[in-house]
Amino acid sequence: MSKARITYKDAGVDIDAGNTFVKLIKPLVKATSRPEVLADIGGFGGLFSLSSGKYKNPVLVSGTDGVGTKLKIAFLADRHDTIGIDLVAMCVNDIIVQGAEPLFFLDYLATAKLYPGKGAAIIKGVAEGCLQAGCALIGGETAEMPGFYAGDEYDMAGFTVGVVERDKIIDGSSITVGDKLIGLASSGLHSNGYSLARKVIMDVMGLGINDTIPGLDKSVADELLTPTRIYVKSILNLLRDFTIHGIAHITGGGLLENIPRILPNGCKAVVDKTTWQVPEIFKLIQNAGNIEEQEMFRTFNCGIGMVLSVPEKEVEEILIRLSGLNETAFVIGEIAKCDAGTECVEMV
């Protein structure tokens, strides 16, 4: 008796589905291309020409990130076409704070079973994020891993590389006492604090994914899947004409943990909590979860996605420019002298 022949598909990996997926995403990827991209996807590596004539002393800046448990909301809602925007945002927003223009992006998608249409929806979001950031999607990896993930769940990671002239690197070292802090409004929770948000909204409040959030007139899915704002083009615009001493991306750790990452010794940030309107979703989470204010400011962005430290004399012109770029911005505080051993961020 002959033994039954076993295929890779029998083991849970469908090569044909993978090929269909690649065909679906090729036009999405091509739409993000830049002149420096030298090859289409499908090769063993992505090719990108860093023109020697364009830069004098270029420094490459890299970043990698994921979207955490925001993915759980996408699973529950069965909506996958915007989570890729979050993935790009988390990476490119990290490198723009050092003054780097994102050049290209790569993604990693791992799933128990690859459904080409669903996978293409995910990459549609990645491509949209790349368009918003002005970077090219030059490659990626899609791993079908049967038995590794529960049900139809998946995980994602993103990788970006950008460039900045060495003498234009922003590292916070030029931040000085008297600088003003400008906060750029976030679009919502962005991609941080979702484990706490889900616990409060779904466990404590008992809301389902399609239920309307009290006082917001939006469903849980609509509110929590709002894409992370990408600030790249606005900040690049500012950098061409203004002096920016430091930039902090307000991600996990909130204002309290991220602003200190750019502060030089002897400086602290004094942030006035009354200078911007905290979005209702954060107030709801705080009230329903009985969460202390300190915990909120070290978990969520609380309405501020980026903080810029700028010379006082340039504040008004920067605010005018940001308004023209469709950014909502607030002067949220200033840089003050800090004694050794004191907190780097003072909320007043």
From Swiss-Prot:
Superkingdom of origin: Bacteria
Enzyme class: ligase
A GO BP annotation: adenine biosynthetic process
GO molecular function, one term: phosphoribosylamine-glycine ligase activity
Catalytic activity: 2-formamido-N(1)-(5-O-phospho-beta-D-ribosyl)acetamidine + ATP = 5-amino-1-(5-phospho-beta-D-ribosyl)imidazole + ADP + phosphate + H(+)
Pfam families: AIRS, AIRS_C
HAMAP family xref list: AIRS
Protein name: Phosphoribosylformylglycinamidine cyclo-ligase
This protein's encoding gene: purM
